[in-house]
Amino acid sequence: MKEFDLESYDYYLPKELIANYPVLPKEKAKLLVYDRRSQTITHTTFEHVLDFFPKNALVVLNDTKVMKARLFGSKHAFLPSKTTEVFFHRFFKDNTALTQIKGKIKAGDKIFFDENYCAEVLELLHNGQRLIAFYDNQTPLNQENILKLLEQYGHMPLPPYIKRADESLDAHEYQSVFAKHIGAVAAPTASLHFSQHTLEKLLKDFKHAFLTLHVGAGTFLGVETKDIREHQIHTEVLRIPKKSQEILQKSQEILCIGTTALRSVEYFKRLENPNQEAFECDIFLHLANPILHVNYLLTNFHLPKSSLLMLVSAMIGLEKTKEIYKIAIEKKYRFYSYGDGMLIL
């Protein structure tokens, strides 16, 4: 069936519609509103986004915070040029971390970030990841100090389709105004559209709940299996506080800010008796595994053949998704992380 064929999720996007910078002020970004009941499309801007939110809906937000996850170092302690890139993925245990390192590397190699800080490659893993340990001289760094190292020397991990180096503006624009718990290597991009003013109005006027899904590097990986049902999606760390769990259990009408919030809610609501706050979320939503518990979604425009495009199709159907994306391209909407948004009602 074509809805399970990977090629059905391909589309052509002119390069000039890939947003390399955010729209400022945030409220001026464009917003496409699709109402499934009336089958209508409205073109507006984010300054009006809350006008479209159903009054009785619970609004769910992901408050993860993006780490400065890209580090540049040298394989030799006294070389001034830092040409070896280390992409920090997540903590493993103690002072070790799972990373991706560009270029040739072997176990035992060291990467120097300055005269004190370095990382040692402990193991080359089968999935392209590298297990490394961080040191200050010969002293192992704990997780708190590794985060300080990333903050001091790291760069914001802009997505690979943004063809420029990170700049000072990215430190705050590639971060939601309600980001709280550090651990993501990519931003939950629908959240980037909210200014402090819009957020305060949302929190005042709507029921809301926060959760934390640390967006992992796997979010940039495309689906590669010809039959999308055979794809194994990446696992991400999810935390839902007890207070938010109680609100979610009672809510019948849910609006998610972004696909990460939606995947988190769908994962949680399918658990029989959740008795903890921390989870490993690996839910892949598509037309054969449809959305059951979320009613509305605010999201950006996603890459061809991506799991996120399949999620949108699971909500509104493949043909309607293609139709709306075609309209968005014709109307010159900006795509991907720094792009415009879409509200599905």
Swiss-Prot record:
Protein name: S-adenosylmethionine:tRNA ribosyltransferase-isomerase
TM regions (residue ranges): none
Pathway note: tRNA modification; tRNA-queuosine biosynthesis
Lineage per the UniProt record: Bacteria, Pseudomonadati, Campylobacterota, Epsilonproteobacteria, Campylobacterales
Family assignment from sequence similarity: Belongs to the QueA family.
GO cellular component: cytoplasm
Catalytic activity: 7-aminomethyl-7-carbaguanosine(34) in tRNA + S-adenosyl-L-methionine = epoxyqueuosine(34) in tRNA + adenine + L-methionine + 2 H(+)
Pfam families: Queuosine_synth (PF02547)
Reported function: Transfers and isomerizes the ribose moiety from AdoMet to the 7-aminomethyl group of 7-deazaguanine (preQ1-tRNA) to give epoxyqueuosine (oQ-tRNA).
Quaternary data: Monomer.
Main location per the UniProt record: cytoplasm
Keyword field: Cytoplasm, Queuosine biosynthesis, S-adenosyl-L-methionine, Transferase
Disulphide-bridged cysteine pairs: none
Top-level EC class as recorded in UniProt: transferase
UniProt source species: Helicobacter pylori (strain P12)
Entries under NCBIfam families matching the protein: PRK00147.1, queA
GO biological process, one term: queuosine biosynthetic process
